[in-house]
From Swiss-Prot:
The protein's name: Rho GTPase-activating protein 18
Subunit: Interacts with MPHOSPH6.
Ranges of compositional bias, category Basic and acidic residues: 27-37, 85-102, 178-205, 212-222
Record's subcellular location: Cytoplasm
Length: 663
């Protein structure tokens, strides 16, 4: 279904989520209106001409106890003025992104494809078994989100008399429910739903696939409320939101911009915390599909609209530094420095800023001269890859301006076109915890290049904030200065009313603040999603084994005999309660280790590294890691605090290998 060809296009020069009121800006206003006009022009009408005067911005009603985020909105408006002046010299060659307005049902169809559920509609509906297996691993709220969108697509296809086999959505979800209600065999990993498997108990021995559900979720007694600052990664965020609604008829009051940000923490998980970059690509793909479904379910539960947005392909330069898609830029860089994950120019600009001391007052806030920035851009384009550019000539504030310009001139936003609206909508979630949960899922959904670059940016911004006593750049200041550079792109946007413009300013600054403050938490993959990935892997393995048995039915006897021999050999090699750890690149390539309650991944690494000699002795902690490979996971890098016995019970068929992380 190609809806792009049949829809009318809208050319956007800046991006705004839902504002429809159009107010023309005035670039020639004098006196008291001048600052207001230029600020408005800077954000929403960068490429517009022929503007008219608008009323002066209404005063902002500020409370007496403003927190750091709202110290001075003037920093935000000043940054927009600086952006406007910078763009006046860099209009040439810019092309607006064309965003097509989708037909009814098209967004839902794209969503199902992104979620890996295209088998639920269209020509492949005749064999939906794979999707039904996927659905059987979903939580109640996730399944509801999927069903809602399948129904919309089915209704739309019927209306349009498409020549597809339109299966009744009730049939699909009836099969899904049957799959969930079937008694699990010993190799099944139980669902992580909060309303399932209560009171079930098994012995302490691990099954062939996983441990029983009480090992999957550490339940908090109903009469013991969880700490408001604890982030529960073991239960679906959407399910938590439902439980919160049921627990209290009155939802937590909507947060205001002057609420201080709490110090959230992640309780220790004995099976180890999983971070982005720890999983194999095939498992990470499943994580992204589940994160999209979970994010949508969370927005559905909280009554917010979740819509992805696609941009039509536009012409972009295929070489250079500024205005180049991240993927193309990284391809260029990797020819120079193999394994590069963050653009070299971006890294160099950050390095140049830090060389001038992060204690410089007004760092990031004070702009470089617009004409000088333009000349530096041209010189960088010509000399950067040749290695002849003179970095000593770049002043610190100029480097900061170039860094922000790089972000603004990306053909598509660093936060991605698909999810920019969802990032902006985070400000509308009722509680800080739910805002954090949504941001966590959104970060997971970003393309690798965008996510890696965002991480480098946030880490740099935190280093700037760490020097706030000297540079006067608090977290609130930095958030307000950087928000328009991330949430406003020179190719996106709509003119809006002043009230809407002000709400967007405060809201995006708030989201920027959350990204900086909670960046360490945001790069964590929730445990309930990892558990669902394990469950999917088990279901897929069962399906593959079933297919294999049909193909090799005549060889069943020989295979069973061989498996028994292998099992006997393995049992003799590794006694009960012992794991064998492989280290193919170290001098001691294998070691049998007795499992104890206290044994952690860091202890296993320490035992191997302590026995290294010669050249291998130079290996340090952080250069090699212990991996869980196979069983019900593809591959997972373990954090130091992983309790090995607990993880062994969760995945008894895994292999344990010490190796370095892939570049």
């Amino acid at each position: 279904m190609n809806w792009l060809s049949s829809s009318s296009g809208v050319v956007l020069t800046a991006y705004h989520p839902s504002g429809k009121d159009q107010v023309a800006g005035d670039s020639h206003v004098k006196g008291g209106d001048e600052a207001t006009s230029s600020r408005r022009y800077g954000q929403y009408t960068i490429n517009q001409e022929g503007s008219t005067k608008v009323p002066e911005r209404p005063p902002f009603d500020r409370s007496s106890s403003q927190d750091s985020l709202d110290e001075s909105m003037e920093a935000y408006w000043t940054e927009l003025e600086n952006i406007k002046r910078s763009n006046e010299n860099r209009q040439e060659g810019q092309e607006a992104i064309v965003v097509k307005e989708p037909d009814e049902g098209e967004l839902e169809e794209e969503w199902l494809k992104e979620a890996g559920l295209s088998n639920l509609f269209g020509e492949s509906i005749d064999d939906p078994q794979e999707s039904i297996l996927f659905l059987s691993t979903l939580t109640r709220t996730q399944a509801a989100a999927v069903q809602k969108r399948v129904e919309t697509v089915s209704q739309t296809l019927r209306k349009k008399n498409k020549q597809h086999h339109i299966r009744d959505v009730r049939d699909i979800f009836a099969q899904q429910r049957e799959a969930q209600e079937k008694p699990p065999d010993d190799s099944d990993l139980r669902s992580v739903r909060t309303n399932e498997n209560k009171g079930q108990g098994k012995d302490d021995q691990p099954s062939s696939g996983a441990v029983d559900s009480k090992e999957q979720i550490s339940r908090v007694p109903e009469d013991t409320p969880a700490s408001e600052t604890d982030i529960n990664l073991e239960v679906s965020f959407a399910e938590q939101a439902v439980n919160q609604k049921e627990f209290s008829k009155e939802r937590t009051q909507k947060i205001s911009s002057n609420d201080s940000l709490p110090s959230f923490r992640l309780p220790k998980d004995k099976t180890g915390t999983t971070r982005i970059g720890d999983l194999a690509p095939q498992d990470m793909k499943k994580v992204c599909s589940l994160s999209l479904i979970e994010l949508t379910a969370l927005y559905d539960v909280l009554g917010l609209e979740f819509k992805q947005q696609k941009a039509v392909k536009i012409k972009t330069r295929d070489s250079g530094l500024f205005g180049i898609p991240l993927t193309i830029l990284l391809e260029q860089d990797q020819r120079k420095v193999p394994g590069t994950r963050i653009p070299l120019i971006f890294q160099k600009l950050i390095s140049r800023i830090e060389e001038g001391s992060l204690e410089t007052e007004g760092l990031l806030r004070i702009p470089g001269a617009a004409m000088r920035i333009k000349n530096l851009c041209q010189e960088l384009e010509a000399k950067f890859y040749e290695g002849t550019f003179n970095w000593e000539s770049v002043k610190q504030h100029d480097a900061a301006s170039l860094l922000k310009l790089f972000l603004r001139e990306l053909p598509q936003p660093l936060l991605s076109m698909e999810y920019l609206k969802a990032f902006q909508a985070v400000q509308n979630l009722p509680t800080r915890k739910e805002q954090l949960q949504a941001l966590n899922l959104l970060v997971i959904l970003l393309p690798d290049a965008n996510r890696d670059t965002l991480k480098a940016l946030l880490e740099f911004l935190q280093r700037v904030i760490d020097n706030k006593e000297k540079n006067k750049m608090t977290a609130g200041n930095v958030a307000m200065v950087m928000a328009p550079n991330l949430f406003m792109c020179h190719t996106l946007g709509l003119k809006s009313s002043e009230q809407r413009e002000f709400e967007m300013a405060a809201g995006t600054a708030n989201v920027m603040h959350l990204l900086i403050r909670y960046q360490k938490i945001l790069w964590t993959i929730p445990k309930f999603i990892v558990i669902q990935v394990r469950k999917q892997n088990i279901e897929n393995q069962k399906k593959e084994r079933k297919a294999m048995k049909k193909l090799l039915k005549k060889m069943a006897y020989d295979r069973e005999k061989h498996e028994k021999q292998d099992k006997t050999a393995n049992g003799a090699d590794v006694p009960q309660g012992v794991i064998r750890v492989q280290a193919p690149h170290l001098s001691k390539v294998s070691m049998a280790i007795q499992l104890t309650e206290e044994l952690k991944a860091s202890d296993v690494l320490a035992r191997f590294l302590s026995q290294e000699s010669g050249v291998a002795q130079t290996l340090k902690k952080g250069e090699v890691f212990l991996y869980e490979i196979g069983g019900n996971i593809g591959e997972r890098c373990l954090d130091d605090d992983t309790h090995m016995k607990d993880l062994y019970q969760l995945n008894p068929n895994a292999e344990w290998v010490i190796k370095s992380k892939p570049v």
